[in-house]
Structures are given as C-alpha cells and as structure tokens.
Curated annotation (Swiss-Prot):
The gene is THOC2. It comes from Homo sapiens. Transmembrane segments: none annotated. This is THO complex subunit 2. Residues 1416-1425 have a biased composition (Polar residues). Expressed in the hippocampus and the cerebral cortex. It is found in: Nucleus; Nucleus speckle; Cytoplasm. It is linked to Intellectual developmental disorder, X-linked, syndromic, Kumar type: A form of intellectual disability, a disorder characterized by significantly below average general intellectual functioning associated with impairments in adaptive behavior and manifested during the developmental period. Intellectual deficiency is the only primary symptom of non-syndromic X-linked forms, while syndromic forms present with associated physical, neurological and/or psychiatric manifestations. MRXSK patients manifest variable degrees of intellectual disability. Arthrogryposis multiplex congenita 7, X-linked: A form of arthrogryposis multiplex congenita, a developmental condition characterized by multiple joint contractures resulting from reduced or absent fetal movements. AMC7 is an X-linked recessive, severe form with onset in utero. Affected fetuses may also have subcutaneous edema and dysmorphic facial features. Belongs to the THOC2 family.
Length: 1593
C-alpha cells in the first residue's frame, strides 16, 4: 500500500469529517476531468476508489461514510458503476485469500451499502458466484454455474442444421449465376447484394459458404476489382470481421500439402483485400507457411553453405579432385532448382508488390532476415518493376540521354499505389526505401541500375552548381547522403553480382566522378571490407573471384600479357576490389610481376582504375606491415615494389592522383617519411624527372643547359611521352592545393627525420630516409619549377622571409623553391622593358636586364637580412648572399660540348635513317623531320643560353664591388661564405655541387675585392674529416663532386705556368698578404708565384690523404663509406702523387680484407674504388715532378707559404707577418688543430740545427749570422748547378719504405733525456771508448757545419728557452689528447714512402746519399715553421735512430732476436739500478748544461729542440693519420713501468709499430758506431741522412 498513500493520505481518513472528505471529493473532481481510459488520471481515479474501499475493510472508515462520498462522486463520471465494480472485484479476490473474517465482513457491508450505485447485472458479471450468493443477489451459486455453462455451449458450439440435399444446390447455382453475369451495365454491388440476401433466405444457404463462393468468383474475375471489393465490404458489414480472414486462411491451408502449389490468383485476391483493409495482415499471416523460424533457419543454412564453399575454394586441392567436386556441386544445385519449396509468404509478398501495396509488402519483409525476400528473383523483379513505375516521371525529365527515345513505363491504375516521383525530393518518400529492401539484387535489372545512376548523376550536377537558399541546401544534402547510402548498399553490391558488365561499370563511373575522392574511397572501403560479408551470394562471389584471380596470376608472364589482361579486365568489371587486393599482394611478394601486371591492366574501366588507386593506398597504409626489413637498416621490399608499381601504373593509365598525394601529405604531417618513396617514383615516372647520384659528368653537364638538352642528354633513359602524365600530376596538385604543402612538409621533415624518426633506428636507415626526403624534395621542386606556369608558381610560393621565418623551411630548401620564381620574375620584367623600348643594341639589352634584376632582387635583399643575425652582414653583403642563392649553373656557363654532342647524335641518327633501306619512305620523312626539328631546337636553345649567360656575367661584374664589405678579416669573410653559402648548397644536389665550385672560380675571375681565393681553396681542402663524417650517403656523393670540380680548377692552374699566370697571376685572390682594410692592390712580391702555388697544391693533396686515411682507420661505418664515396668522385684529379696514391691503396686494401665478412656494402665500395685506383696508377707522378723542390740557400730568409701545419689565419709570403693581422692569428690559434687554412709565418730556413730558433721564427737570428751564412750560400749554389739534387718534402720524407710509420719519440722531456743519456751510458769499457770517440766526431762535424755566428748570450738565452718550450709542448699535447676524448691520435708525423729500398741499386744509393750530404736538409716550399720542424726532426733522428747499412733480412732477424733476448735479461737484472741511474743522469745533465763548452751546448740544445719539435709535430693538424699507434705505445709504456728507458723495450716497441720497416737494436747501433769510427766526418753525415734520403724515394 505504499503507492496508495500517495493518492489518499492517512491524515484525510483520520480527519474525515473535518477536512478529509472535502479533500477526497476535490481530488476525485480533478481526476475526473480527463474522461479517457488510457490516461494516467484514469488510473489514479481507480486507485483513489480502491484505497478508500481498503480503508473501510481495514476498519479505519465506516461503510456509511464511504457509500455517501461514493454517491457524491458518481456525478463526476458516467462510467462510475463499472469502475466501482472493478474495484469490488479486486477486493473480492483479496479478501477471499485473507484468513481474517472481519475484513470479509466489512467488504460485504460496503458492497451492500453501494448496491444502489452498481446494478446487479454488472456485479453478476464481475464477482464470484459465492460472493453473489453471500450478497443475496443469487439463490445458489452451484445452480448459477450450471446455467452459465449451458448458455455458453448453446451460443458457441451448437450449429444450425441445413437441408443440403434438397434446397442448397439450386441456391448455390443461382448464386454463381448472379455473380458471373455481365457486370458492365448498370448493375451495382448493392443490387447484387440484395439478390444474394434473397437467395440465402430462400434457400437457407450458409452465409460463410456464400462468402467463399464470392471469393472464388473474385479470383476468376480479377478485372472487376472495384465491384467485388464494394460487394465484400457491404457483405462483411453483416458478418463477423474475422470470418473473411478465416475463410482465406482455410483456402491457403488447402494448398499446404507436400506437392501443393498455391495459385497466383489466390495471392492476388488476398493482396487486394489487404490493400483495401478488408482483412488484417497479422490475422492472415498466421495461416501462411513456412513459419518465420523456418525461414531464419534456411537463411542461416545458406550462409553456412556459402562459407563452406569459401573454405573449399581456399583449400589446396589437386586439380582432378577439384573438377570432380565442382561437378557434384553443380548437380546438387540443379536438384535444388528442380524442387523449390512453395513459400506462401513470398507469394503473397509478390502479389502485394504487383498491385503496388508497398506498406503491407514492407511489413512482410520486415518479418524476414535482411534481403531474404529480395534474394528470390520474382520478388526482386517485382520490387524493380514498382521502382520503375515510381521513378518514371523524374527519369523522363532528368535521366534520359540526349537523342535517346526510351520506353515509357505505364503507371499502376491502383490509386493506393505509391505516388510517382516528380522531383529529387520525392525520391525520399518511397524510392530510397524500396532500394534498401532490394539490396544487391538490383543485379537482376541492369536497366533500372542504369536509370538510378543517371538520376544520381543529374542530381550531382544540380547539387554542385546549386547556389540556392540554406533550407534547400540542407534538403539536397539529405538527398546526397541517401544517394551515397543507396550506392553503398545497392549499386556496388549489385555490380558485384552482375556478370562482368563493363557498360554498367562505365555508367556508374559517370556518377562516381562527380563525387569527391573522399566519398568515393569511403564507398570502396565499405564495398571491399564489409559488403561481401553481408550476403551468402556475395560471400560465394568473393571466393570465386579470388580463385579465378589466382588462376590468372599463376599464368601471367610478359609473353601472354594480352590474353591474361583480357581475363583480368573481365574479372575486374564486377569485383575490382577483391581482384586488385589479390594482385597487389602478389606484387608485394614478387617484384618481377610489376611490368606484366601494369601492361595487363589496359582493359580496365575508369571505375576500376579509380578502385585500383584506392586499393594501392589501402595496401600502403596497412598497419600490420613492417616498413623496414628485419635488419632495421633498409626499407622493406614490399614498399619498394608498391612504389615502383605506383609510378608505372599512374604514368600509363589516367588514374586520379589526389588520394595518393593527400595520403603522402598526411603521412608527412604525422612525421612519417617512408611513403615519400611513392611520391619519388610517381614524379620520376610521370614527369620524367630522375633523381640519381650515379649521373655521369656528361649527364650532369647536360643538366646545366636548357629544358630540351636536359630531356635529351640529362637522363639515363630517354624520357618520352610524359607530357600528358605530367599535366595530370600538375592538375591533381593544383586542384587540391597540394603543391606547396608537400614541398614545405618535405623540407621540414628532412630535418625532422633525424629527431622524429632517428631515435632507435639504425644510423644507416636514418641516412637513407634523410636522403629519400631530400631527393624527393629536389625532384618535386624541379617538377613544379618546370611544369607550373609563372603565375601559378608565384601565386603559390611565398617570399623567402615568410618561407624561412613563418613556415620554418631550411634556408637551402627555401631558396631552392624560390629560385625559379626569381628567374621567372626577372625574365618577365626584362621582356616588358624590351617591349617598351625597342632598342636592338646589346648594351641596351644588358642595361635593361640589369634594371630588371635590380627591380626583382631589391625586395629579396631586404628579406634575406632577417634570415641571419646582423653580425653576418659585416662579412658578406645581403646582395652577395642573395645573388649566390638565386643563380644556377644555367646562369654561369653554357655547356657547349653537351649541345655539340647531342647535335652530333642527331646527325648520326639522320644518316642511319638515310642508310636504312627497309624503312618506309613516309616513316623516313617523319623521323628525319623530327630529328631536324630537335636539332634546330637545341641550337636555338644554346644561342639563347649564351646570350643569357653574357647578361648575367655583365650584371655580376657591376655588382661585385659591393659583395664583400671587408668590415672584418678576410678569414672571417671566407668562414661566413663557406658556412652560409658553399657548404649548405654543395650538398643540396649534384648540379649545385658543380655550381658552388664554378661560383668560387667566377668570384675569383671577376677579381672580386676582399675575396681571397687562396684562403677559400685552402679552407676547403685542408680538413675534410668533419664534413665527410657528417654527410649522408648521397650528400657525400655530392660533396665529392664539389671537391672534384674544385680540384679540377686547381689542377688546371697547377699543370701549366702560362695558365696560372694568365688566370691567377695578377688576381687579388692570390695575394699572400691579407689585410682587413680592403686594399687589394699590391706588389708583385705579394702575389703567390707559380712554384709556391705548386707546393701549396701538394700540401692540399697531402691534407686530403691525411683526412682520407684517418676516416678509413676509424672503423666507423659512416666515415668509411663516405670517404670511399668522396674518393671515388675525386678520382679523376686525386691522387696525382705516386706515394700518396700508394698510401691510400694500402689503406683501402686493408678495408677490403677487414670488411669482407663484416660489412659487405663497405667491402663492395672499397673493392670498387681499389680497382679504379689501380687503373689510375699509370697517371700518377713522383713527387718531385708534381712540385719543384730546389734545396734552399743557407741562412737565407725563405719565402714559403702554407705548409701542412698551417692554420686558418691570414698569412703573408716572403715577408714578415703584418701587425694588423697579428690579432687575427691569435684568435685563430684555437682552430689550428682542427682546420687547415692559409697561414704564413716567416722563418729562417737555416741549414743547421743551430740556426733555428726555439719558436721557429727567423727573427731571433742575428744579422751577423745572416751575413756569415751568405758565404756558404754561394758555395751551395755552385754545388746545386753541378748536382741537381732530387728535392724532398716533409710529407714525403716522413714516408717509410712500406708506408707503415716509424715511431716518433713522444715521451715527456724527462724520459727523452733519460733515453739520450742512457744511449750515451757505456755498458763496458769498450763501449765507453766508442761512445767518447763518437761524441768527439759529432762535435767536429757540428763545428764544420755551423758557423759560430751567434754570441754566447744568445746561446744561453736559447738554452733557457728550450726546456720550457718542451714543457709547453708536452702540456699542449696532453690537452689535445683530452680534447680528442679517446680518439686515437697518430704517433708518427706523416706517411712513409711506398718506394721499396731494393728498387735502387747500391752504388746509386750511395751516390745519392753523398749528394744529399752536401746539402743538409732541403727545404719544402710550404710554411717555414713546418720546414724547421722537419729539419729538427731529421737531425733528432740522425742522433737517436742511427740507421745501419743495408743488411740481408735473414741476418737482421737473427740479430734482432738475439739482441732482444739479451736486452730483456739485462733489463730485468738492472731494473732497480736503472731507476737510480736515471735520477743521477738527470742531475748530471743539468750540471753539464752549465759547464760544457759551446760546441757541446749547441749539440745538446739541438737534441732537446728536436725532441720538442718532434712532439709538437705529431700533434699538428698535418700529422699522418695512423690512430692506433700512439695508444699502443702509451699502454705499453704504462705496463712496462721502469723498463721504458731500456733499449730492449725500445727495440720491442719498434718491432710492433713499424711493420715491414727496419728494426733497430743496441746491437745495430754498436755496429754503426764501429763503422762511423772508421769513416770520416763526411761519411758520418752520409749515414745520418741515409734514412731521410730513403724516405724521399
């Protein structure tokens, strides 16, 4: 009773008399306002009466009070007695169940009190007989029950008896005659009905049987629908409504026998009766078979069978078994066709559809599984017929093609049929709905298919052109969504079930091409991935398509492309998605299928090509496929195959590219660059723009010409017939605004690759992705530049500052995109000016061109200022920067040889055409005309380019004075030029690499003020390690091309004095005194002469060798790969020097051996380079032929420029450093180890060690010394004339016999001194005597060779300087090691000479040694500092490492082995003693320095100086790059501890470090000392120079 309290609260009952009664009456009045029985107020009213009565039963209220209030309420509602009787009925049941007798009594009292409100009849209907008896309404309940049963039996079960034998036959005969009469006259249904009534009454006919006869006659006379319908309506008004339905049901039941067939006339009668609502569908439906659950089971069985077929088709079965199974399947299907089950529900449905009763037909189909009804052909055709009728007026108006008559469809006469569609809006009413029920079974009616598609096409035209109101737009959008749904659910599935109908496919494309690609691809996606699973028939079709596709693909080859192509075309018309999905899966596995597949696709329809584009994108976007191979260093082959297929298929066939391009753009947005491979292939194939690093120099040269030359000579394959395909690509890009976004995304992604994609990926793969991104950008940008019109290009590409600052495009890419725009602008302005003033003079034309350049480039000059900090513009002007980035190779030079080559090819071609007798005359004429036209085009293009280049050069001549501002040093200017211009652009593309080299040459040729060509070239060649190491594979290739072009220029100047004098002699770029004041004029003395230039070129070659060897020995994949690529590119011009070439050859050979198993790609590169290097060996020359090496005059101040140790600071040649450059030199000292530029330090090239000052500067020598040395200088010159001594250089001199380095002493001063003293420490009395004699002989030698020119005070000063300088060098060396951070630094100073000793016969060697002895150490024309270092080093070696005379190798080995054993024993025994001796010697040595005579002081000082220099040299930037040796030496010295000083350890170390070189030991030295004793002092000198002379060889 929780709910009762809500309606009648207990408070009302408690205060009934006061307020409760009034409240209750008020409530009932409100609830009685709504008289409806369905409303909630009616239920609340019932509840209120129930609660009131319940309170009486509980005893809370008296029955009199309740009856009084109920009598008042009875006025509110007429149905009060009925409601009250219902309440009493419920209470009667409830109180009967209760055990409490009091409540039952209260209930009886209440009913009795209310008898005047409810009639007896109503109570007798509602209450139990027992209750009625207790109320006194009936006498006995039992009698009452019996009477009730009798009455019901009489009413419902007793039948009226008729006399069937006598009267009835005549009555029925008369009835049939009445119904069968001619109804065309004035006879009406009412008149007939009166006659029927008379017959029933007269003959006592059964009304049900009469009704049955009427239905039978109706079946036979369907043309009189209206008459019979009105007759039945009138007749049924006298019968029970259900009677008609039961009779019809009985008729249907009669035909439900096993072989029974329901007549169509019965279906039609039932349908008409349903349409006019004479019967109810629900009532009739239960009489029809089969039952709904049987239909559902049948549907499930069909799906299971379809899946079973799929499984069988996908199983691998032998062909014979397969054929047997197929035959059995066919037999089963035939059996099924013979015995179709009779489905009465479908029969009725067909009849309904035929008469146009869509509503009832829809209700029946809703009871069945989706498309179950339509899967029966008759039903499908009936729906199609109804749709034909409904869309007829609209189709006649908008769908009939021009010139077509068509066959009009007659409308249904039935007024209740669906209304015909007059407009697109009317289609929403019924037509779209009908199509949804039809589904894929529209395939039964291709004509209706075509009609719908044509209506859809007309709607899309109207939709796209419509500029109507907002309301209309909303309506049309609803129709569009309905049309898309119909396409998805009906048109495409129906196409799948049609038997390869190409016409339907083309018709459908007529509508599809009006959709945007997003709609189309969504539809294809649904079709491919969902539609085929929605219906059993489609499941079978999919399996059969795949089976057939497999059959075709297995047999597809290049030879049978045509027949296979036809089969593919036939299969694709109906099921393209399934077919292409399978074909693409095969292409991804077998890339050799690409060409035959592409050729076989020529029989497709337009729709199929579009579906193919979608399938390609879906295959590319497959998330389950890995885009990298398992090694994580290369892109997967499936992706490469798909990319290749894309390029080929999009080029050959007219396929819409928008979707593919948008997909690539979306991938780039998401930071994924793998799919750029697709774009690269598409642009390459469609536009003919090839991007490859393997271009020959001829191709590269052709690429610097005009468009015609590029097409003819710039690519590997002849690019033909790309006009249409490139136009399609351009249109796709412009129509969807993808041109600039793709460029910007690629430019941004290029740098993003490293950070977004480079995290966990292999460095090799990151490099490949970077290259792919960059190459595609270059290729794509090239396509846009050559294919977009000027207006299109300018409209889309923003200004340079916007590109860089707003879009964050890297500067090189931004200028690359803007460059064509500047060229277009300038040419259009120039044309305007030419037209405005028609002056034919060349000067006028040039002036106009320069004016147009200024107009176009002025805003660019302003824009570029924002790209860099203001400090940059102190070194180079914005004008120079913009000029460099805006020009191309086309602007700088005309490739005459390339034009000539192509013209000659055409001439040869024409001659071949003339000679060909088999060619038909017409074709001959055509081909010759083509060749002639092409030739004329090329010649015209060459002429045009020549004029253009002349104009550009004139412009540059005028601009050059404002290019370099000279606000800071030339060194800074060159740094900025290289950093902001040359290096970013030289690795951008192969043509840009050539451009950079040619631009540097052009700036030099223009005699540009403040530009040091020498410094620029020196900075480029001096240290390439860091640049090479930071390149990707393709960048390394381009950098190699750049170096190659730079070397080509340098080699041209180097090879001929006249060329050098002509092109460099008086040019400011070759000034050797570099000032920051802008003064470039100068004395002839300031210019670098030809011989010194050759020395500088040798230095550059040496630097390249050093860097190459360093990279090769790092073991790093990138270093090795890149340097091999660079070396391969510069092979035409480097190496030219024999010993450098041999050193490289050995290192590369080592790489070949090491990498053969580990890294096959490096092995292949190394082998390739090694082979090419060997073939170039015959062109290499000895070093003395490469640069002339005169021995320097003694004690003269030598003018030498830029040795291998030079740094990047400004320098002078032949004079002292200028004061205004000294500050620059100081600031650049930190760069001296990492960078090699042009640096000149004036030093004295003294012939004696004594003549060298400790800091390497000639300034410390006194004037006296110079004068005294002049005398010897004269003698030297006389000797020079007599004996043309072969000159040596520091680089070559430090090359050993077999290219392995000799160890250089790199210990701290203490160790070196200890070793010196130790060597002088005798082991026996004999040794002591030998040692003293040797010392004496050396003193004599030094006295003869060194004039005592310097005062004692100078000597003392030098003695004080020397140890401190050594300490500084030691510190410097340590700090350098720390900076390198574990990088292995070389031990020896340079490479060894590869010339073996045995090549020169003994007497000749002796003779050469004597010649060399007469000139103590020849000077190299590189830096004086380097010369001094070399002199000191050689003198140190003379003292420390005495070389024994040539011995046989076997003897040497024996002696070494014995000596090694002895020395090891001695070293163990005297280990402690040595330590003590070392300390004593150190003390003695310091005392001796104070006490020894001047001669000995000179010698010792020389030794110390040499060692210091030796150490200093090993850490200079020009050291030989053998990284492992130093670390080995260091480790050994640590492990040995106190054995360092012993000769045995030294000899052991020598043994390991210099493989193939002569090993030295104490035993050897003793022999040398004995021999030296016998020889004269000249002889001693001869031996001392033995080692260095060998190195020259």
């Amino acid at each position: 009773m929780a709910a009762a309290a809500v309606v009648v609260p207990a408070e009302w009952i408690k205060n009934w008399e006061k307020s409760g009664r009034g409240e209750f009456l008020h409530l009932c009045r409100i609830l009685s306002e709504n008289k409806s029985h369905d409303s909630s107020t009616y239920r609340d009213f019932q509840q209120a009466l129930y609660e009131l009565s319940y309170h009486v039963i509980k005893g809370n209220l008296k029955h009199e009070q309740a009856s009084n209030v109920l009598s008042d309420i009875s006025e509110f509602r007429e149905d009060m007695p009925s409601i009250l009787a219902d309440v009493f009925c419920i209470l009667d049941i409830e109180t009967n169940c209760l055990e409490e007798k009091s409540k039952r009594d209260y209930f009886t009292q209440l009913v009795l009190a209310c008898l005047y409100l409810v009639s007896d009849t109503v109570l007798k209907e509602r209450l139990d007989p027992e209750t009625l008896e207790s109320l006194g309404l009936i006498k006995q309940s039992q009698q009452f029950n019996q009477k009730s049963v009798k009455i019901k039996t009489k009413l419902f079960y007793k039948q009226q008896k008729f006399n069937l034998l006598r009267e009835e036959n005549e009555g029925y005969a008369k009835l049939i005659a009445e119904l069968g009469q001619d109804l065309s006259g004035s006879i009406t249904s009412d008149l007939i009905l009166e006659n029927i009534k008379s017959l029933i009454g007269c003959f006592n006919l059964d009304p049900n049987r009469v009704l049955d006869v009427i239905l039978e006659v109706f079946e036979c006379r369907p043309e009189h629908d209206d008459f019979f319908i009105s007759l039945l309506e009138s007749y049924m008004s006298m019968c029970e409504p259900q009677t008609l339905c039961h009779i019809l049901g009985f008729k249907f039941k009669f035909y439900q026998e096993p072989n029974g067939e329901t007549p169509s006339s019965l279906y039609r009668v039932a349908a008409v009766l349903l349409q006019f609502n004479l019967i109810d569908l629900d009532d009739l439906y239960v009489h029809l078979l089969p039952a709904d659950n049987c239909i559902m089971d049948e549907h499930k069985r069909e799906i299971a069978e379809a899946k079973q077929i799929v499984r069988k088709l996908t199983m691998v079965v032998l062909s014979s078994e397969k054929m047997d199974e197929r035959e059995k399947e066919k037999e089963k299907e035939e059996e099924k066709v013979e015995k179709p089950p009779d489905n009465q529900k479908l029969g009725l449905l067909e009849a309904l559809l035929k008469i146009g009763d869509w509503q009832h037909a829809q209700n029946i189909m809703d009871q069945m599984p989706p498309y179950y009804a339509a899967s029966h052909k008759l039903i499908a055709l009936a729906i199609c017929k109804l749709i034909h009728i409904t869309i007829e007026p609209l189709y006649r108006r908008v769908g009939v093609p021009k010139g077509a008559k068509g066959s009009p469809v007659n409308a249904l006469q039935n007024k209740r049929a669906p209304k015909q569609a007059e407009s697109f809006e009317d289609l929403r009413r019924d037509v779209f709905n009908m199509f949804c029920y039809l589904g894929p079974h529209l395939s039964h009616d291709p004509i209706l298919f075509a009609k719908v598609v044509r209506i859809g096409k007309s709607f899309m035209k109207e939709f796209q052109s419509d500029g109507s109101k907002q309301e209309d737009k909303e309506k049309t959008e609803v129709i569009l969504s309905c049309l898309l749904s119909i396409t998805d659910q009906v048109l495409l599935p129906s196409l799948s079930l049609m038997d390869c109908n190409a016409c339907m496919s083309e018709e459908l494309w007529g509508m599809f091409k009006t959709f945007p690609y997003q709609h189309r691809y969504r539809l294809y996606g649904q079709w491919k991935n969902e539609t085929y699973n929605s219906h059993p028939l489609l499941v079978k079709v999919k399996a059969q398509t795949i089976d057939r596709a497999k059959y075709i693909m297995k047999r597809l080859t290049k030879e049978n492309v045509k027949p296979s192509g036809r089969q593919i075309g036939k299969l694709s018309h109906s099921n393209p998605t399934i077919l292409f999905d399978y074909i693409l899966s095969q292409i991804q596995k077998y890339d050799n299928l690409i060409t035959p597949v592409v050729d076989s696709l020529k029989y497709l329809t337009s729709l199929n090509y579009d579906v193919l584009a979608y399938c390609i994108i879906e295959a590319l976007a497959n998330p389950e496929k890995e885009r990298m191979k398992h090694d994580d260093t290369t892109i997967s082959s499936w992706l490469q195959s798909l990319a290749s297929f894309c390029g080929a298929v999009f080029r050959k066939y007219p396929i819409d590219l928008a979707g593919l391009l948008q997909y690539v753009a979306n991938q780039l947005k998401a930071g994924k660059s793998f799919d750029l491979l697709i774009l690269k292939e598409v642009v390459q194939k469609m536009a003919g723009i090839e991007i490859t690093e393997e271009m020959t120099m001829e191709q590269l040269e052709a690429m610097t010409g005009g468009e015609q030359l590029k097409a003819e000579g710039g690519y590997f394959g002849q690019i033909r017939n790309t006009k249409k395909s490139s136009q399609r690509l351009k249109d796709a890009l412009l129509d969807h605004d993808l041109a600039l976004p793709l460029c910007l995304l690629m430019a941004q992604q290029r740098n993003g690759v490293i950070f977004q994609e480079g995290g966990e990926k292999h460095l090799k793969l990151v490099g490949k992705l970077y290259d792919q991104c960059h190459d595609t950008l270059v290729q794509f940008g090239g396509f846009l530049a050559s294919n977009l019109s000027t207006e299109d290009y300018i409209k889309r590409v923003p200004s340079i500052d916007v590109l860089c600052n707003e879009f964050h495009t890297p500067h090189d890419a931004a200028f690359f995109l803007s460059r064509p725009m500047y060229a277009h602008h300038i040419s259009s302005k120039y044309d305007e000016l030419k037209k405005s003033e028609k002056g034919s003079k060349q000067q006028h034309k040039v002036h106009k061109y320069i004016t147009s350049c200024e107009m176009v480039m002025a805003p660019v000059h302003e824009a570029v200022v924002s790209l860099h900090v203001s400090k940059v513009w102190d070194d180079i002007s914005p004008q120079f920067y913009a000029t460099f980035w805006s020009l191309t190779m086309y602007d700088l030079a005309v490739p005459h040889t390339s034009y000539e080559r192509e013209v000659n090819k055409l001439k040869v071609q024409m001659k071949a055409i003339d000679d060909n007798q088999e060619m038909p005359p017409n074709k001959k004429k055509k081909e010759k005309e083509r060749c002639t036209a092409l030739q004329d085009k090329l010649l015209e293009e060459e002429k045009k380019q020549m004029e253009h280049v002349q104009r550009v050069l004139q412009r540059l001549k005028l601009e050059k004075d404002n290019w370099l501002l000279a606000k800071s040093t030339k060194n800074e200017t060159i740094t900025k030029f290289l950093q902001l211009c040359i290096f970013p652009r030289c690795i951008f593309s192969a043509i840009d690499a050539v451009y950079c080299a040619r631009f540097v040459e052009l700036v030099h040729q223009q005699k540009t003020p403040n530009f040091s060509t020498l410094l620029c070239y020196d900075r480029v060649f001096s240290d390439i390690i860091y640049t090479v190491a930071s390149c990707t594979e393709n960048e390394a290739s381009r950098y190699g091309r750049f170096l190659c072009c730079m070397l080509e220029t340098v080699t041209r100047w180097h090879s001929d004095r006249a060329t050098y004098e002509k092109e460099c002699g008086n040019y400011p770029g070759f000034l050797t005194i570099l000032r920051a004041t802008g003064f470039d004029g100068g004395n002839k003395a300031d210019q670098l002469d030809y011989e010194n230039f050759r020395h500088v070129v040798h230095k550059w070659h040496y630097k390249l060798t050093k860097a190459s060897v360093h990279c090769l020995e790092t073991g790093e994949y990138t270093h090795i790969r890149n340097i091999l690529i660079v070396l391969t590119k510069i092979l035409p011009w480097y190496p030219k020097v024999l010993n450098l070439g041999q050193a490289l050859e050995r290192r590369v050979h080592k790489i070949c051996q090491e990498e053969k198993e580990k890294r096959p790609d490096l092995y292949a590169l190394a082998m390739g380079y090694s082979g090419q290097l060997k073939s170039r060996k015959s062109y290499m020359i000895p070093e003395n032929e490469f640069h002339h090496k005169d021995p320097p005059p003694r004690n003269a101040v030598a003018s030498v420029q830029n040795g291998p140790g030079g740094g990047p600071s400004s320098s002078s040649i032949g004079s002292a450093s200028k004061s205004d450059e000294s500050s620059t030199e100081e600031t650049d000292k930190s760069r001296e180890r990492s960078q090699c530029g042009v640096k000149a330090v004036n030093k004295a090239s003294s012939t004696t060690p004594k003549g060298n000052s400790s800091n390497g500067n000639s300034g410390s020598n006194s004037n006296k010394a110079v004068k005294e040395n002049d005398k010897e200088k004269g003698k030297e010159k006389e000797k020079e004339k007599k004996e043309k001594t072969p000159a040596t250089t520091p680089e070559a001199r430090v090359l050993g016999k077999d290219g392995k380095e000799k160890p250089k002493e790199e210990r701290p001063n203490k160790d070196e001194k200890a070793r010196e003293t130790k060597e002088r420490t005798p082991k026996s009395d004999k040794e002591k005597e030998k040692f003293k004699k040797e010392e004496k002989a050396k003193d004599e030698k030094f006295k003869t060779t060194v004039p005592n020119a310097e005062s004692k005070s100078t000597q003392e000063r030098e003695r004080e300087k020397e140890p401190s300088r050594e300490r500084d060098i030691a510190k410097e060396m340590k700090s350098k090691e720390n900076v390198k951070g574990g990088e292995k630094t070389p031990v020896s100073g340079s490479l060894k000479s590869p010339v073996p000793r045995s090549d020169i016969p003994e007497p000749e060697r002796e003779q050469k040694r004597r010649k060399i002895d007469t000139h103590p150490s020849p000077s190299h024309s590189s830096t004086v500092k380097d010369s001094l270092i070399e002199l000191k080093e050689s003198s140190a070696k003379l003292y420390i490492n005495h070389t024994p005379p040539p011995l046989s190798k076997s003897k040497e080995r024996e002696m070494d082995k014995k000596d090694l054993d002895k020395s090891r024993e001695r070293s163990r025994e005297r280990e402690k003693k040595d330590e003590k001796d070392r300390k004593e010697r150190k003390r003695d040595h310091s005392n001796n320095d104070r006490e020894v005579p001047p001669d000995l002081t000179k010698r010792r000082k020389e030794e110390n100086g040499t060692m210091g220099v030796s150490k200093h040299k090993s850490e200079s930037p020009c050291e030989s790059p053998y990284p492992n040796e130093k670390d080995k030496e260091k480790n050994k010295s640590k492990s040995s501890g106190k054995e360092k000083g012993s000769d045995s350890f030294k000899s052991e170390k020598m043994d390991k470090i210099s493989s193939g070189g002569k090993k030295e030991s104490r035993h050897d030295k003793e022999k040398i000392e004995k021999k030296e004793k016998r020889d004269s002092s000249g002889g001693k000198e001869e031996k001392k120079h033995h080692k260095s002379s060998d190195k020259h060889r």
